[in-house]
């Protein structure tokens, strides 16, 4: 049994099972699209984590940590002479990032992620001092502070030896920031609601317009492009929310996904869509394996000969070529048939990647081949 191809066979079997033809199911608009303008916004900030057990920044290599601490102490009324550079090991300079959810209001908490930006070994047990979080416009939208939760562990010895488990230089603070400024209201002063599909598809857009018109009356919705549907709505915010509550629960059958094969060249993962078809083609695929082994020979001179012991390496190179087997795809071959044919010849994931690329180059693969 070829164990190397077993994970691929299990994956292929699972994909083939999912590809069994089934009637199209109705999906809600809220699962297919998002309301235009309703999105999160990235926040970023800089701060200091204190209280570390000797695992903080080595300040001789990260002078900005000392400078930041001096500035902080100065704001608190503690003056540190300019010619004094404390050698600290319990402080770390960190970057803070978070996402400001849509409709977040002042006073609401949000989660934050804290990451070391210098040479701290671990942030475990540290506390983040108050730091502002800014948006892309430079405005402060939240203030962050709190005790870190770190899933990893790290320690370093004086001789430079180091041990770490997971990633101890990154931590999170649940509800670690408080919103101080709200985003502008996206619903103010507009007579239309924009719906943007998660995936570009003209069929789904057309069906969405028809479903909305069927539920709310003809002319309520119009297609803008392959992603966007515009819906007429009242200008009163309360009425708009009521319309959206009904609108997002309207059901429709989305269009079929385009035929696509996605290949991860690094891991050998291959995902084949249900609608992939292959034109008539014959394929022969073999592989060449080169094995290099190294042995060491020791030559010991005779007693009292005055010679020296010599160590010589000995390399053995062996090349084996597996016999290739040819198989044939008829016109209109489906996903299930592709998987069965590849499994019969015992192809590994890497072999399947090469076969699919060759089929695409030959014009026999009627699908988009995407390599990630």
Curated annotation (Swiss-Prot):
Residues 1-26 form the signal peptide. One of its GO terms (biological process) is bacterial-type flagellum-dependent cell motility. GO terms for molecular function: structural molecule activity. The keyword Signal applies. Keywords: Bacterial flagellum, Periplasm, Signal. Its main location: periplasm. Pfam families: FlgI. It comes from the Bacteria. Belongs to the FlgI family. The basal body constitutes a major portion of the flagellar organelle and consists of four rings (L,P,S, and M) mounted on a central rod. Assembles around the rod to form the L-ring and probably protects the motor/basal body from shearing forces during rotation. NCBIfam families: PRK05303.1 (NF003676). PANTHER family: FLAGELLAR P-RING PERIPLASMIC PROTEIN FLGI, FLAGELLAR P-RING PROTEIN. This is Flagellar P-ring protein. It comes from Xanthomonas campestris pv. campestris (strain B100).
């Amino acid at each position: 049994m070829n164990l190397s191809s077993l994970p691929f066979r299990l994956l292929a079997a699972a994909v083939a099972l999912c590809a069994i033809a089934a009637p199209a199911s109705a999906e809600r608009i809220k699962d297919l699209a998002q309301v235009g303008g309703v999105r999160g916004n990235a926040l970023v900030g800089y701060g200091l984590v204190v209280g570390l057990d000797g695992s903080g920044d080595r300040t001789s290599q990260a002078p900005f940590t000392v400078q930041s601490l001096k500035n902080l102490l100065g704001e608190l009324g503690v003056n540190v002479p300019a010619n004094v550079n404390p050698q600290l090991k319990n402080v770390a300079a960190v970057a803070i990032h978070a996402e400001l959810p849509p409709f977040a209001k002042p006073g609401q908490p949000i989660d934050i992620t804290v990451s070391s930006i210098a040479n701290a070994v671990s942030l475990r047990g540290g506390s983040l001092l108050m730091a502002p979080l800014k948006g892309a416009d430079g405005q402060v939208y939240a203030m962050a502070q709190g005790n870190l939760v770190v899933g990893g562990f790290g320690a370093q010895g004086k001789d430079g030896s180091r041990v770490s488990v997971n990633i101890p230089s990154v931590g999170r603070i649940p509800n670690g920031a408080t919103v101080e400024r709200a985003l502008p209201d996206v619903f103010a002063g507009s007579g239309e609601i924009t719906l943007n599909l998660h995936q570009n598809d003209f069929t789904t857009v057309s069906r969405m317009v028809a479903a909305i018109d069927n539920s709310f009356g003809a002319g309520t919705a119009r297609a803008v492009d392959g992603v966007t549907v515009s819906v007429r709505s009242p200008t009163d915010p309360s009425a708009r929310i009521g319309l959206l509550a009904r609108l997002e629960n309207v059901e429709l059958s989305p269009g079929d996904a385009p035929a696509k094969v996605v290949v991860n060249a690094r891991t050998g993962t291959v995902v084949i869509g249900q609608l992939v078809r292959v034109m008539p083609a014959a394929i022969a695929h073999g592989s060449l394996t080169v094995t290099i082994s190294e042995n060491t020979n020791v030559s010991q001179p005779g007693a009292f000969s005055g010679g020296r012991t010599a160590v010589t390496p000995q390399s053995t190179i062996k090349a084996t070529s597996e016999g290739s087997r040819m198989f044939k795809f008829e016109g209109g071959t489906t996903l299930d048939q592709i998987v069965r044919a590849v499994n019969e010849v015992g192809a590994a994931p890497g072999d399947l990647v090469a076969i699919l690329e060759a089929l695409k180059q030959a014009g026999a693969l009627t699908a988009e081949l995407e390599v990630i």
